[in-house]
């Protein structure tokens, strides 16, 4: 896949751009002659499924791939807090909270909004570990996958 993966890991691609890139990829794979109509024998969604489990060809859905790369950037910001990028973003967008709890902020850059888009995917897969318990919010943190936090009982 000859796509600008570095740009995809820094910025969110628009849905229109993803659609155009997907269209170019499908045209490349399904066209044999330029002047004839093309028949797509298999749906593109079927080709995007994994080879091993679902019988697809393993092509990537560009929107999902883009969000996964941005989630990787969010993960790096959380787990490498002393890098220049982490310190810069923390001082600008979340000086008094954590990466997972911060809001988009006022006048955010496009790169920050893109990283927040990746954080949404990251938050679906993260669970809370207790550690020393100082930063644990019993009623707000996720403890079990696919469960929303329980409200406090009154």
UniProtKB/Swiss-Prot annotation:
The keyword Mitochondrion applies. It comes from the Eukaryota. One of its GO terms (cellular component) is mitochondrion. It is found in: Mitochondrion. Keywords: Mitochondrion. A stretch of 270 kb of the mitochondrial genome is duplicated within the centromere of chromosome 2 resulting in the duplication of the gene. The expression of the duplicated gene (At2g07737) is not demonstrated. This is Uncharacterized mitochondrial protein AtMg00310.
């Amino acid at each position: 896949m000859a796509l600008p993966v570095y740009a995809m890991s820094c910025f969110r691609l628009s849905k229109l751009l993803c659609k155009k890139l997907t269209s170019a990829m499908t045209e490349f794979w399904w066209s044999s002659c330029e002047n004839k109509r093309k028949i797509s024998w298999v749906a593109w969604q079927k080709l995007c499924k994994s080879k091993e489990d679902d019988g697809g060809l393993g092509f990537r859905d560009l929107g999902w791939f883009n969000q996964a790369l941005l989630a990787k950037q969010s993960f790096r910001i959380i787990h490498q807090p002393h890098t220049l990028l982490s310190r810069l973003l923390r001082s600008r967008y979340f000086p008094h909270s954590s990466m997972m709890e911060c809001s988009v902020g006022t006048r955010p850059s496009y790169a920050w909004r893109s990283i927040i888009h990746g954080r949404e995917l990251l938050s679906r897969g993260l669970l809370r570990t207790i550690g020393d318990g100082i930063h644990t919010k019993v009623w707000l943190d996720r403890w079990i996958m696919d469960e929303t936090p329980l409200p406090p009982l009154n």
